[in-house]
From Swiss-Prot:
Bilayer topology annotation: Multi-pass membrane protein
Biological processes, Gene Ontology terms: lipoprotein biosynthetic process
Protein name per its UniProtKB record: Phosphatidylglycerol--prolipoprotein diacylglyceryl transferase
Function: Catalyzes the transfer of the diacylglyceryl group from phosphatidylglycerol to the sulfhydryl group of the N-terminal cysteine of a prolipoprotein, the first step in the formation of mature lipoproteins.
Transmembrane parts of this sequence: 22-42, 59-79, 107-127, 133-153, 186-206, 216-236, 251-271
Pfam families, alphabetized: LGT
Keywords of the record: Cell inner membrane, Cell membrane, Membrane, Transferase, Transmembrane, Transmembrane helix
Source organism of the structure: Bacteroides fragilis (strain ATCC 25285 / DSM 2151 / CCUG 4856 / JCM 11019 / LMG 10263 / NCTC 9343 / Onslow / VPI 2553 / EN-2)
Keyword RNA-binding: no
Protein family according to the UniProt entry: Belongs to the Lgt family.
The enzyme's E.C. designation: 2.5.1.145
Chief place where the protein resides: membrane
Gene name, Swiss-Prot/TrEMBL: lgt
Amino acid sequence: MNNLLLSINWNPNPELFNLFGISIRYYGLLWAIGIFFAYIVVHYQYRDKKIDEKKFEPLFFYCFFGILIGARLGHCLFYDPGYYLNHFWEMILPVKFLPGGGWKFTGYEGLASHGGTLGLIISLWLYCRKTKMNYMDVVDMIAVATPITACFIRLANLMNSEIIGKVTDVSWAFVFERVDMQPRHPAQLYEAIAYFILFLVMMFLYKNYSKKLHRGFFFGLCLTAIFTFRFFVEFLKENQVDFENSMALNMGQWLSIPFVIIGIYFMFFYGKKKSVK
């Protein structure tokens, strides 16, 4: 009882307002804010490097659709393939088809960060093919901005009372009333704070050491830091799907491991290999 009294009761309405029957939710708004800040940061880097403005113009669309498609497919195929392979159009469209007929607009409720990362990496490759830019230069610039977007995405999860933490007795525990009345780790907030700090570190390194660091360093640091933290914070989270209960590590942790390995390679080995050549 004492732990419950010390906890923070959390029960915001995930819907900001309703416009002509279409629900405008904090989730979508915070996603948009995160992408907007990333847009500003990357645009700043393009101008700082004196890159042709015409090359920057299509970048937003490649990133937006790459992240959205990758994150959606990642959620559907990694976390609930049985359902979505039998409800294919719900994987593609932001609606839910009702059993009695008809449909309901829901937005894309399930988005996976690992899938979004893969989608972004692929879309940037397509962008670089079109603009003839160096791929590592572009992913480094995107990497500097990525943590601020990740921060807002986790705040979006917090407003949705989703990706909740395990039951705890810490004094800053949240009671997610839409889930139950148990005090839990605000894991979404842990990630949001960590990613915001990483963003500040990235900006500091870019402004002070970008000319001294090899190509691929920022890309590697971003992958390593985000997915290492993600791996460990998963121990404080409830599993998202039932099949994870029988796993030693959950799906988020297994998917994080290859990204950490790739990140370490680009931080410590990629530049050296290029230098030898």
